[in-house]
Amino acid sequence: MKTGKFIVIEGLEGAGKSSTHQVVVNTLKEFGIHEVVFTREPGGTPLAEKLRYLIKHEVEELVTAKAELLMLYAARVQLVENVIKPALAQGKWVVGDRHDLSSQAYQGGGRGLDQHLMTTLKNAVLGDFKPDFTLYLDIEPEIGLARVRGRGELDRIEQQNLDFFHRTRARYLQLVQQDPNAVLINADQPIELVQQDIRKAVQKFIEENV
């Protein structure tokens, strides 16, 4: 049995990750790929969802940047080992809302955590496991945050200042440029053009890898 492929959707808040899922799924179906598993990070298992709550919501004490990072990796390893790897082994495709690139950008870039720590933790937890394909939806932080604020109450991460998101975006752009399996999508465009670019990118990946 062929193993499945792991596609990840990345981007800042308000970039349109949620609507991208359906475009990816529809494109996979066009190529006869119907067994698709959805994941989100942090989350995706009972333990990981509890950690998601602690990461996203205000709690009774200050959550340090390192504590936040460790909770994210604890949630990630649960999801990878208990959900993603088994699904891929069964030949299913996995479409993930965020993966390790988020931590590298948000905690490594936004929080400014030590790069040696980031790399060491990534290697210890994930080893050589990584997505087969990453769609990075690039958006100006001002535009993305305006969209998010229009939805209502903000979570703990969304409440960070604009400089935090500019640092996060800068790290995203740096890492995406270095990753041959990542594609940058201009999410500042009208939604129709964004979805068109996503469809083309996914089609190209399928044609080259299936």
From Swiss-Prot:
Species this chain originates from: Histophilus somni (strain 129Pt) (Haemophilus somnus)
Q: Which Gene3D superfamilies match?
A: P-loop containing nucleotide triphosphate hydrolases
In terms of InterPro entries, this protein maps to: P-loop_NTPase (IPR027417), Thymidylate_kin-like_dom (IPR039430), Thymidylate_kin_CS (IPR018095), Thymidylate_kinase (IPR018094)
The UniProt keyword set, sorted, is:
ATP-binding, Kinase, Nucleotide biosynthesis, Nucleotide-binding, Transferase
Give GO BP annotations, semicolon-separated: dTDP biosynthetic process; dTTP biosynthetic process; dUDP biosynthetic process
The record's section on Pfam families has:
Thymidylate_kin (PF02223)
UniProt protein name: Thymidylate kinase
Q: What does this protein do?
A: Phosphorylation of dTMP to form dTDP in both de novo and salvage pathways of dTTP synthesis.
State the gene name recorded for this protein.
tmk
Task: Report the GO molecular function annotations.
Answer: ATP binding; dTMP kinase activity
E.C. code: 2.7.4.9
Q: Kindly state which reaction or reactions the protein catalyses.
A: dTMP + ATP = dTDP + ADP
Q: Which PROSITE patterns match?
A: THYMIDYLATE_KINASE
Give the UniProt family note. Belongs to the thymidylate kinase family.
Please list the residues that bind ATP. Answer: G11, L12, E13, G14, A15, G16, K17, S18
GO CC terms on record? cytosol
Q: What class of enzyme is it?
A: transferase
